[in-house]
Amino acid sequence: MALSKVKLNDTFNKDQLLSTSKYTIQRSTGDNIDIPNYDVQKHLNKLCGMLLITEDANHKFTGLIGMLYAMSRLGREDTLKILKDAGYQVRANGVDVITHRQDVNGKEMKFEVLTLVSLTSEVQGNIEIESRKSYKKMLKEMGEVAPEYRHDSPDCGMIVLCVAALVITKLAAGDRSGLTAVIRRANNVLRNEMKRYKGLIPKDIANSFYEVFEKYPHYIDVFVHFGIAQSSTRGGSRVEGIFAGLFMNAYGAGQVMLRWGVLAKSVKNIMLGHASVQAEMEQVVEVYEYAQKLGGEAGFYHILNNPKASLLSLTQFPNFSSVVLGNAAGLGIMGEYRGTPRNQDLYDAAKAYAEQLKENGVINYSVLDLTTEELEAIKNQLNPKDNDVEL
């Protein structure tokens, strides 16, 4: 079956229908929620650090603390605006630092804690108690603890949020099937940080963020906007650079936008994502133009800013035992598909097109502005005749 016979889903009709809606939905975040301001950012960073230095730390609350830290970087005012713009009715709790007295082995001790409704003073005190035990052990081993190994290192909060950036890429599955991939990726990109902190346990921290995002979906909205703001801010630490790379990979792929609909145009995004998987090659341009119309916030950052990379992905899989046409953003990435194709006509058409590409090498490479290295890589992938490559 020819590609021209495989029609794009009725995305545009649905878009028109949604655009005519005169009403908005209001959601509730429940009871009072904690929205910290900039002034407690340092304390929240230290809380993250205490968890990181604690050997065999209990990360039950790490996801929550990480999100509170993210909100403190955005600031109270912007966090409230994000939630209200997303349709949430918010009753916000102000967060301050207070002194808390707690009995420790029969002795009363003082701790500086935050006035949080989501995390009791006792839990915060216990986090510090456990971290002190690990810190004493570090002092014995090292003699003096270097700044980058301490609980108050300024990048502790961002280290925790790097794991959140990995989790957010997997929420599209609707379950925790992506946990193994998150752990593997974290072990790779955060390997230096794991040498610094014995409490940096990717599996436990990832599960904590899964729990937070599943239980409090409004945190997804906050995290996406935080990620955009953080990634667009120049400068910063090495870990901030790692975070930006991880987050923009997730945002660019559009998976979170398309599946969860965390922004204003959410439903349109979901439809476009599912419809574009059924798109034929001749309609890729049509989908691309639709992406331009919606703008980067719709989850099309990757193809709008790097169409070359997306087009190159068409040629990356020379063996088409099975083919899926279209990626979430609608540019038609072709990759191997395991299992029975849901659309046999689409499968046959995509497979035929891919084999034709591989056999003939009829791609206008000149429009891709390839470097010498990229061109060589593509030639090796497709093994085209030299005169078939248009430079």
UniProtKB/Swiss-Prot annotation:
Region entry Involved in RNA synthesis and encapsidation, spans: 1-364
GO molecular function: protein serine/threonine kinase inhibitor activity; RNA binding
Localization per record: Virion; Host cytoplasm
Pfam families: Pneumo_ncap
Entry annotated with the keyword RNA-binding: yes
Statement: the UniProt record of this protein carries the keyword Nucleotide-binding: no
GO biological-process terms attached to the record: symbiont-mediated suppression of host cytoplasmic pattern recognition receptor signaling pathway via inhibition of MAVS activity; symbiont-mediated suppression of host cytoplasmic pattern recognition receptor signaling pathway via inhibition of MDA-5 activity; symbiont-mediated suppression of host NF-kappaB cascade; symbiont-mediated suppression of host PKR/eIFalpha signaling; symbiont-mediated suppression of host type I interferon-mediated signaling pathway
GO cellular component, one term: ribonucleoprotein complex
InterPro entries referenced in this protein's UniProt entry, alphabetically: Pneumo_ncap
Phosphotyrosine modification, residue list: 38
Entry function: Encapsidates the viral RNA genome by forming a left-handed helical nucleocapsid that protects the RNA from nucleases. RNA replication depends on the availability of soluble nucleoprotein. The encapsidated genomic RNA is termed the NC and serves as template for transcription and replication. Together with the phosphoprotein, sequesters host NF-kappa-B in inclusion bodies (IBs) thereby inhibiting this host defense pathway. May also act as a modulator of the innate immune response by sequestration of host IFIH1/MDA5 and MAVS into IBs.
UniProt subunit comment: Homomultimerizes to form the nucleocapsid. Binds to viral genomic RNA. Interacts with the phosphoprotein P. When in a monomeric RNA-free form, interacts with the phosphoprotein (via N-terminus). Interacts with protein M2-1; this interaction allows the association of nucleocapsid with the matrix protein. Interacts with host EIF2AK2/PKR; this interaction inhibits EIF2AK2 phosphorylation of EIF2S1 and blocks EIF2AK2-mediated translation shutoff.
Membership in a protein family: Belongs to the paramyxoviruses nucleocapsid family.
Name the record gives this protein: Nucleoprotein
